[in-house]
């Protein structure tokens, strides 16, 4: 089990990476005695690295989901009103892909005697590229009435365009994170306190 204060630091780092500034209440909660006392131990550094990558992914997804329920609540209302199951699914999937976008994997495991270091690779969508794509293709979903200074947006076309982009675009390398481990007297690996 990850020490909760360490998990909070990781969550904060991942949120900063995702340009998210608010902190969910759970991240500010004081750890209980049980949470601070239990640090999971592993027989191998590779196993620890894989387990920790899963934990990092869950923490980032949970934190993002708690902070952002939707990427656009106004579109949520529109989609709920029109009652189109396909469009609703595409919108929900787009929300999930953007809110829970981070993939954490083990990049490198360095074992040196009783000291260990794991480098994690964090991937996600290039949101600037998505914004550029949506901007470059605005004519597919938006009409400008320059006489009235108004823009009419076809939300259904916008959702489909965004969904198809996310579904067909590979995630990019956003960051790496290094975590130190140590082998204790019991010959088991654990996070460095």
Question: What do the PLM-derived regions correspond to, one by one?
Answer:
Residues 30-105:
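Core segments of small alpha/beta cavity-forming domains
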Residues 60-63, 125, 187-189:
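Primarily extracytoplasmic ectodomains and periplasmic/lumenal surface modules that are beta-strand-rich
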Residues 2-30:
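Sec-dependent N-terminal signal peptides of Gram-positive bacterial secreted proteins and lipoproteins
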Residues 68-74, 153-160, 172-177:
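Short glycine-rich, low-complexity/disordered patches
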Residues 52, 104-106, 118-120, 179-181, ...:
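Hydrophobic beta-strand residues in large extracellular and virion-surface proteins
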Residues 139-153, 164-193:
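Short beta-strand edge/turn micro-motifs at domain boundaries
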Residues 87-158:
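Surface-exposed, charged secondary-structure patches
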Residues 19, 108-110, 169-171:
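Generic marker of residues within folded, mature protein domains
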